Amino acid sequence: MRDTSSGRMRTGVTGLALAVMVACVMFRAESGIARTYSFDAAMLKGGGKGVDLTLFEEGGQLPGIYPVDIILNGSRVDSQEMAFHAERDAEGRPYLKTCLTREMLARYGVRIEEYPALFRASGEGRGASVAEEACADLTAIPQATESYQFAAQQLVLGIPQVAPSAAEGDWPEALWDDGIPAFLLNWQANAGRSEYRGYGKRVTDSYWVSLQPGINIGPWRVRNLTTWNRSSGQSGKWESSYIRAERGLNGIKSRLTLGEDYTPSDIFDSVPFRGAMMSSDESMVPYNLREFAPVVRGIARTQARIEVRQNGYLIQSQTVAPGAFALTDLPVTGSGSDLQVTVLESDGTAQVFTVPFTTPAIALREGYLKYNVTAGQYRSSDDAVEHTSLGQVTAMYGLPWGLTVYGGLQGADDYQSAALGLGWSLGRLGAVSLDTTHSRGQQKGHDYETGDTWRIRYNKSFELTGTSFTAASYQYSSDGYHTLPDVLDTWRDDRYAYRHTENRSRRTTLSLSQSLGQWGYVGLNGSRDEYRDRPHRDYFGASYSTSWNNISLSVNWSRNRNSGGYYGGWSRTEDSVSMWMSVPLGRWFGGADNDISTTAQMQRSTGQDTRYEAGLNGRAFDRRLYWDVREQMVPGSESHADTSRLNLTWYGTYGELTGMYSYSSTMRQLNAGMSGSMVAHSEGVTFGQRTGDTVALIAAPGVSGASVGGWPGVRTDFRGYTLAGYASPYQENVLTLDPTTFPEDAEVPQTDSRVVPTKGAVVRAGFRTRVGGRALVSLARQDGTPLPFGAVVTVEGERGQAAGSAGVVGDRGEVYLSGLKESGKLKAQWGENSLCHADYRLPEEKGPAGIFLTRTVCM
């Protein structure tokens, strides 16, 4: 915000009186009362010589750059600084007008493609590139209005043809940003030492490195995961988990993948492959058009990042505010296995829990097509399995009356299968689907077998009762039915032992989550797997979580009945119960930057001693250092398993550092780790904390040390750049800078930037900056008289940063300017065609309030 206090102190009483009168004129003009006012310039000091007050007399305002709220059809849609220029209406009255770009109108939901003349006039004859950035002519839209309310600092738009916002998350394709060309690298490194002192001293060292390089060129994304590990007595080993190239096909809402990936699991079980895949990309589609996805609920103690993994792969990362949260837009990917949820609190703590997951009923909106085409080789995690060629085609289509038809074909050497199903949306009663799959396959050493499987699935959310999600499924498989992995995994190198595959006949699952309002959430889930060659396997789970007055509590119970041996040689039932509580102590010991909490935890499992743990954690150094001290006790344990542990984490501008020391009577452990990310781009190389697949490059040139988004340690580097990760693709992401962390000589007129990245993009989130001194400049003409009151002064010759600072001259020829270099040029304009130029140089010492005071002559 501009500090003009010094300028006002030097303005005479007459100047203040004039300002009041001008404000009154503006108010009356905004009220729609057309009157003509006349000011006596002689009332100003110096007799008002050379002063042109015509603009004020006509109820106009000075052109310039103003911060405005943009109001569209009564709703605020944006806030930013905009440049306004003076124009006159049909009756000759002055008014201020700004430039509405194609990108802005698309962001606000205007159907710009329906009005070809909206940008044609302003871009005509100036080249295509200029036309893209041309200003909109709203007269091309019938009944559209535009009005700048100067007193309220609002740009009010009335546009009848705004796209409806019924499809939540449907951001126009015109806003999707493929980002900039870049090289990315996420990295982690850990080293540990364990010293065992039970029966003879033994020391074990371990080292682990993870590298995730990537390249972005236009819409193409190349990604790889490479790891290296070494432990005592073993040599280091490099391993590449996957490498693939992919791109979005925006026009058909699809994605093309070349390399190593997994097929979707909506019809057939997911299959790892190496080859090519083209499929629908649901992240490009509004939430209400997508296939059903599970809901993950929980409670965050602080602003937290929620990570959801399936089969070890990160499928969702989202930032939530403190309190209860619900993730409703999870992609249905992977193998249909359970979801592992991690709540990463901003204080460094983490909650981890599991959400049982069953592929839900298939019910698509009318007219929506979802498909997948895959060709390549089978890619087993077992190196002994042969790389058999395979292909898969699946399709789902939404029909009228709430029906969905779907099916697919799957084939490989020694295996073929076909599936057909029908889904039905029952409206308020939920959705149900029924399908069957016929398979024919030959396992190694066996004859061909054929079989069928039938599956019925149901899911529903009951909003009135607060039941957030219910899912039930039942699957029956006949003898001789096999999935593709069941068959291909048997074709192995003869040097390796044959691996038995599960011969499951039935599978039943149930999951329920119930909201209790202010009392929290309760969840129930269970499953039963029945086999032909072994006893059944059962799982039951229950959980409860709540938060009251920042005190968090969670209780979990689970029961597993596992059978051993392929013919039921043994079975075991294992119960596990845990309770966790966190109580903040900030009101007594902490503060805004060093929240202190105490935690207590109890864990008990069948056949194991009960474990109790008490801890104390907090933050220091502007929340960048997280510390955690814990003591674990096992009463009655003969192994003396009581353990003390200290964890430290430093969240830095260029990455994170971690350290852990653990001590007990029989063992000592020491671990240290580093992690971070790097993006090489056309403007240099930027380092930061670890990021996800989609990254925002924060660019605020010259503003170093600015905090981004409130996350600990995420600050701009010495050049004003940093990385903000885990952006949501095809959705609007708002990135903010904290103005209280700016350097003294830096200003950022607009502290938030909005981007809509495509999946895997590195998007540039640029901020206009003014870096330099703040000064009160006294401007005089060659004859020594001050510049006329109302003259507009701007800084010339600024490139690469924000538009130069601008100010209005007072009645003594003084103007307040910011973002000034040590020396430069000024331009002053007044009246119709009057202007002059001046050179300035800032003095060595600052005046009051850190503002330079200087004089110069305008010629």
UniProtKB/Swiss-Prot annotation:
BP GO annotations: pilus assembly
Signal peptide: 1-28
Keyword Transport among record annotations: yes
Pfam family for this entry, one: PapC_C
Topology versus the membrane: Multi-pass membrane protein
InterPro entries: Fimb_usher, Fimbrial_membr_usher_CS, FimD_plug_dom, PapC-like_C, PapC-like_C_sf, PapC_N, PapC_N_sf
Entry GO CC: cell outer membrane
Keyword ATP-binding appears in the UniProt entry: no
Keyword terms of this UniProt record: Cell outer membrane, Membrane, Plasmid, Signal, Transmembrane, Transmembrane beta strand, Transport
GO MF annotation list: fimbrial usher porin activity
Subcellular location: Cell outer membrane
Domain of life per record: Bacteria
Entries under SUPFAM superfamilies matching the protein: FimD N-terminal domain-like (SSF141729)
Stated family: Belongs to the fimbrial export usher family.
Described purpose of this protein according to its UniProt entry: Involved in the export and assembly of AFA-III afimbrial adhesin subunits across the outer membrane.
Descriptive protein name: Outer membrane usher protein AfaC
Species of the source: Escherichia coli
Classification of source organism: Bacteria, Pseudomonadati, Pseudomonadota, Gammaproteobacteria, Enterobacterales
Gene giving rise to this polypeptide: afaC
